[in-house]
Amino acid sequence: MAQYDVAIIGAGSAGALIAARLSEDPARNVLLIEAGGRPSDPDILKPSMWPAIQHRSYDWDYKTTPQEGAAGRSFAWARGKGLGGSSLLHAMGYMRGHPADFAAWAEATGDERWSWEGLLPSFMANEDHVSGGDGIHGKDGPMPVWIPDDEVSPLTQAFMTAGNALGLPRIPDHNTGQMIGVTPNSLMIRDGRRVTVAEAWLTPEVCARPNLTIMTGTLTRRLKLEKSHVSAIELAGPEGLATVTASEIILSAGSLESPALLMRSGIGRENVLREAGVTCRVKAPELGLNLMDHLLGAGNLYATKKHLPPSRLQHSESMAYMRAGDFSAGGQPEIVVGCGVAPIVSESFTAPAPGNAYSFLFGVTHPTSRGEIRITGDAPDSPLIIDPRYLQTQNDRNLFRAALGAAREIGHRPELAEWRDHEILPKSLAASQDIDTFIAKAVITHHHPSGTCRMGKDEMSVVDADLRLRGLDNLYVVDGSVLPSLTAGPIHAAVQAIAENFTTGFK
């Protein structure tokens, strides 16, 4: 039986970073386990191929339950399967979040390490930012952060000018602590190519370290528990079943697979485990609960007066964050409007041909609806029940109305007259019920599932402020599942900062 000092389960946005950082110590024997392979599809590297690369062999391609708040639709949840995890598939946006987001984390955990100030060194350590070295952005880190300029579509330029005319300030980027305003999206792109976390952290030099073992195509079946200790990890790989041991185990399989593996191992809510035929060995009353995600309305659709050239980036080029009902207000964002240089609509509607229309996406930055994930059996291939319970709170419905209103106000501005012929969707909506019906049909996932193993200072939380799983002495969870609440924008930058912050304190 192979033995390691540290075993990391999952080579995605957190796991790849953790493996690279912890293996910097040549005396530490590190194992990185990944269920997927080493994807070589050249389309991954092409920013303009997002989101067309979803549903391929390196996508877990989950499905949610039908959502009452979204016109009864089920949603496809793209989750990366392979070295790099969901950085293989995401929209490449790099947005840290607002300082108030992290103040909520510090309050939830009772630990200032999770505040904006506490996480800033971790953000900067990860970044190779075009503005790096200015005291707020990192320089020479593994992950490039690029702000487009001439590459931005003229439609996006007009969108930003329209937002500015309404009172939104022009900001340098989304990552200075001020998110409200207009700016091109910061992107994890170098020389016109997507950069995954595998490329950034698992470089040939890192992979050649004698103290780092990387297993691909290897599924973690379950964790073997002895009292308050994980004694072994049961694997299924290319050569069949195997068991390994490690002094410390770090679970970084993501917001769906991390709680699923814990449940299959006998950790979780007693009733859920009992229904799945699993004996409960460690009670975790909130494991799998607190499931959060961002939604975007797709969309506020306009026909063009003239041909719209395709985006040279990733279609959604600028996200304008703002308060609801006041374009000139500052503080923590409540809603967002994004410029889509393509006719982006949900499957409820028929999209016009590319080049003939464009969409303004709209969403809520801090939704209060919460869902859950459950296992249905003890086998890794047993289906997961994923129920995000979208749009179940009045707060979310009210703010989505405000977000749609903001999108339409920007969309009808004179600054966009060069491009706008007429509005296709939603046309006239009189009553609140009509607006809610349209939104329910229009929303799509922003692909930010999180929160299912939330960190906190209370005993009900799944992990503590050190990210150690309550009830076990050698198991940590480090990925998007530990978020106690959502950041205002895409969560990828925050997940990387969580992983970096964790490694600095890991002994």
Curated annotation (Swiss-Prot):
<dbReference type="GO" id="GO:0042820">
    <property type="term" value="P:vitamin B6 catabolic process"/>
</dbReference>
<dbReference type="GO" id="GO:0050660">
    <property type="term" value="F:flavin adenine dinucleotide binding"/>
</dbReference>
<keyword id="KW-0560">Oxidoreductase</keyword>
<keyword id="KW-0274">FAD</keyword>
<keyword id="KW-0285">Flavoprotein</keyword>
<dbReference type="Pfam" id="PF05199">
    <property type="entry name" value="GMC_oxred_C"/>
</dbReference>
<comment type="pathway">
    <text>Cofactor degradation; B6 vitamer degradation; pyridoxal from pyridoxine (oxidase route): step 1/1.</text>
</comment>
<dbReference type="Pfam" id="PF00732">
    <property type="entry name" value="GMC_oxred_N"/>
</dbReference>
<dbReference type="GO" id="GO:0050237">
    <property type="term" value="F:pyridoxine 4-oxidase activity"/>
</dbReference>
<dbReference type="InterPro" id="IPR012132">
    <property type="entry name" value="GMC_OxRdtase"/>
</dbReference>
<protein>
    <recommendedName>
        <fullName>Pyridoxine 4-oxidase</fullName>
        <ecNumber>1.1.3.12</ecNumber>
    </recommendedName>
</protein>
<comment type="similarity">
    <text>Belongs to the GMC oxidoreductase family.</text>
</comment>
<dbReference type="InterPro" id="IPR007867">
    <property type="entry name" value="GMC_OxRtase_C"/>
</dbReference>
<dbReference type="InterPro" id="IPR036188">
    <property type="entry name" value="FAD/NAD-bd_sf"/>
</dbReference>
<comment type="subunit">
    <text>Monomer.</text>
</comment>
<feature type="active site" description="Proton acceptor">
    <location>
        <position position="448"/>
    </location>
</feature>
<dbReference type="InterPro" id="IPR000172">
    <property type="entry name" value="GMC_OxRdtase_N"/>
</dbReference>
